Amino acid sequence: MNYSLEFFPPKDQESFKDFIDQARLLSIFSPEYMSITHTADTVDNNQTMEAVKILKKNLSVEIKPHMTCINYSKSEIMEMAQNYLSLGVDSIVALRGNTKQSVSNREPYYDNSLDFIKALNAGFDIRVSISGYPEAHPESRGVIADFIHLKEKSDAGVDEIITQWCFSNDLILRYRDLCYARDIKIPISPGILPISDIKKVKYFAKLCGSTIPVEIEKAFLNIEGNDDAAEDLGVQFAIQQIDDLLNEGIDNFHLYTLNRGDMTRKIIEHFEAPNRIKTVSSEMKAS
């Protein structure tokens, strides 16, 4: 079993210590990499890059930033990529992202992830991961169109598909089989989200077009108000989901940590002890 871990960058300096503590807690399990979601107002005010800097400085785990292209000019996004390479990053998650501004009267920009991926591979010696959607992208034009686009991105030079979190293994396995049927042979890492707050997960599921199986929702509603029981149940569901996918031949997983190392740690410990305990300084500075 191989796994990667996803974090989001802290919103302020006060949150950095806990962020670092959670990353350090999980680094002893030797994940394939830690990815950091994209949060940046401008090229110069990039919280993701600050998080990458501190983790690269203090951990011997591969750090993989997410990059979204639609809110930056072509020159800005290429500058950002170069800045990451200067930090020793050699792999990124390339995404289109959601627009935050009017697209009129702007410098030329990449309005889709395919062109962005092509530009990254043409300009840099870099490995690229992309997103996948077992339940279809919210802006899906249909299954055929989605997989034509995915095949184009695969052929443009991609090393991995990280899926949106999905609680249905049937949908994940169907997605894998559809990829293979269309000669998309790059590794697929299903996204696994341990649930602790069912109301928050329902809210985000609505935004991204994901579904929550009725039996899972009912199980959490039956213990509403008991946070400890909810966390235990979330861990149990995640373990069962991974177990079932392992039995179907899938052995790469992307764990959405939500910056909470405790639940993720319990899931990993179910499958393996730490592969290698690293020596990490206890005095990690957010600078």
Language-model features and meaning:
Residues E14, P108, N112-Y133, D183-V235, ...:
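Active-site pocket-lining/capping segments in soluble small-molecule metabolic enzymes
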Residues E6, M34, Y84, K153, ...:
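Conserved, mostly hydrophobic/aromatic
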Residues S30-A51, G97-P108, V158-I172, T257-G261:
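Glycine-rich, proline-tolerant flexible connector loops at the mouths of alpha/beta enzymes
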Residues N2-D18, I63-S75, S129-A145, N222-Q236:
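Active-site mouth loops of central-metabolism enzymes
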